[in-house]
Regions:
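Short N-proximal segments of mature Sec-exported proteins
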Residues: 24-74, 85-90, 94
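Short, low-complexity, Pro/Ser/Thr/Gly-rich segments in the mature regions of secreted, periplasmic
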Residues: 95-107
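Hydrophobic alpha-helical elements and their junctions with loops/disorder across both membrane
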Residues: 14-17, 56, 98
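Classic N-terminal secretory signal peptides
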Residues: 1-23
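Mitochondrial intermembrane space
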Residues: 13, 19, 34, 104-107
Length: 107
Protein backbone atom coordinates (compact mmCIF):
# COMPACT_ATOMS: atom_id res chain seq x y z
CA UNK A 1 0.00 0.00 0.00
CA UNK A 2 2.85 2.36 0.85
CA UNK A 3 4.44 1.73 -2.54
CA UNK A 4 1.19 2.46 -4.31
CA UNK A 5 0.75 5.73 -2.41
CA UNK A 6 4.37 6.67 -3.06
CA UNK A 7 3.91 5.96 -6.77
CA UNK A 8 0.73 8.01 -6.94
CA UNK A 9 2.47 10.81 -5.05
CA UNK A 10 5.40 10.77 -7.46
CA UNK A 11 3.11 10.93 -10.48
CA UNK A 12 1.07 13.73 -8.93
CA UNK A 13 4.22 15.70 -8.10
CA UNK A 14 5.44 15.29 -11.67
CA UNK A 15 2.15 16.56 -13.05
CA UNK A 16 2.04 19.52 -10.67
CA UNK A 17 5.64 20.53 -11.28
CA UNK A 18 5.54 20.09 -15.05
CA UNK A 19 5.32 23.52 -16.60
CA UNK A 20 2.56 23.75 -19.17
CA UNK A 21 3.86 24.41 -22.66
CA UNK A 22 1.94 27.48 -23.79
CA UNK A 23 3.14 29.38 -26.79
CA UNK A 24 2.93 33.15 -26.67
CA UNK A 25 0.37 33.80 -29.39
CA UNK A 26 1.21 37.52 -29.54
CA UNK A 27 4.86 36.72 -30.23
CA UNK A 28 3.94 34.18 -32.89
CA UNK A 29 1.65 36.77 -34.47
CA UNK A 30 4.38 39.42 -34.43
CA UNK A 31 6.86 37.01 -36.00
CA UNK A 32 4.42 36.20 -38.79
CA UNK A 33 3.76 39.89 -39.42
CA UNK A 34 7.50 40.47 -39.80
CA UNK A 35 7.50 37.94 -42.65
CA UNK A 36 5.04 40.23 -44.45
CA UNK A 37 7.06 43.36 -43.71
CA UNK A 38 4.59 44.58 -41.10
CA UNK A 39 6.26 46.04 -38.05
CA UNK A 40 5.07 47.91 -35.01
CA UNK A 41 4.50 47.37 -31.35
CA UNK A 42 3.69 43.77 -30.53
CA UNK A 43 0.88 44.69 -28.12
CA UNK A 44 -0.69 47.18 -30.52
CA UNK A 45 -0.71 44.76 -33.45
CA UNK A 46 -2.15 42.00 -31.25
CA UNK A 47 -4.79 44.46 -30.02
CA UNK A 48 -5.79 45.27 -33.62
CA UNK A 49 -6.18 41.56 -34.36
CA UNK A 50 -8.21 40.93 -31.21
CA UNK A 51 -10.46 43.94 -31.88
CA UNK A 52 -10.93 42.70 -35.45
CA UNK A 53 -12.18 39.38 -34.06
CA UNK A 54 -14.45 41.19 -31.64
CA UNK A 55 -15.88 43.33 -34.45
CA UNK A 56 -16.65 40.17 -36.42
CA UNK A 57 -18.23 38.50 -33.39
CA UNK A 58 -20.40 41.54 -32.65
CA UNK A 59 -21.43 41.98 -36.29
CA UNK A 60 -19.74 45.38 -36.70
CA UNK A 61 -17.91 43.91 -39.69
CA UNK A 62 -19.73 41.21 -41.64
CA UNK A 63 -17.24 40.55 -44.44
CA UNK A 64 -13.52 39.96 -44.70
CA UNK A 65 -13.28 43.08 -46.89
CA UNK A 66 -14.73 45.23 -44.10
CA UNK A 67 -12.29 43.70 -41.64
CA UNK A 68 -9.35 44.23 -44.00
CA UNK A 69 -10.33 47.90 -44.36
CA UNK A 70 -10.51 48.25 -40.57
CA UNK A 71 -7.06 46.67 -40.23
CA UNK A 72 -5.64 48.86 -43.01
CA UNK A 73 -6.98 51.99 -41.32
CA UNK A 74 -5.24 51.06 -38.06
CA UNK A 75 -1.80 50.39 -39.52
CA UNK A 76 0.86 52.87 -40.59
CA UNK A 77 0.25 55.00 -43.66
CA UNK A 78 2.55 53.04 -45.98
CA UNK A 79 0.82 49.71 -45.34
CA UNK A 80 -0.34 48.09 -48.57
CA UNK A 81 -3.73 46.50 -49.14
CA UNK A 82 -1.96 43.16 -49.53
CA UNK A 83 -0.32 43.58 -46.12
CA UNK A 84 -3.69 44.40 -44.55
CA UNK A 85 -5.10 41.15 -45.93
CA UNK A 86 -2.01 39.23 -44.73
CA UNK A 87 -2.45 40.79 -41.29
CA UNK A 88 -6.13 39.81 -41.32
CA UNK A 89 -5.35 36.23 -42.31
CA UNK A 90 -2.76 35.83 -39.58
CA UNK A 91 -5.02 37.47 -37.03
CA UNK A 92 -8.00 35.28 -37.82
CA UNK A 93 -5.91 32.13 -37.81
CA UNK A 94 -4.32 32.88 -34.44
CA UNK A 95 -7.02 34.76 -32.53
CA UNK A 96 -10.39 33.66 -33.96
CA UNK A 97 -9.97 30.63 -36.22
CA UNK A 98 -13.73 30.16 -36.23
CA UNK A 99 -13.87 33.24 -38.52
CA UNK A 100 -11.49 31.80 -41.14
CA UNK A 101 -14.35 30.69 -43.42
CA UNK A 102 -15.11 34.39 -43.94
CA UNK A 103 -11.62 34.90 -45.29
CA UNK A 104 -11.77 31.76 -47.38
CA UNK A 105 -15.05 32.92 -48.88
CA UNK A 106 -13.20 36.04 -50.04
CA UNK A 107 -15.97 38.32 -48.91
Amino acid sequence: MKRLLAGIGAVAATLVLAAPAHADVDTDFTNELHIYGIYGQKDYNAWIAKITCKRLNKGVDTTAAQSAKFVHDQLVKDTTTEQAWQFLGAGLRLYCPDKLPLLQAGQ
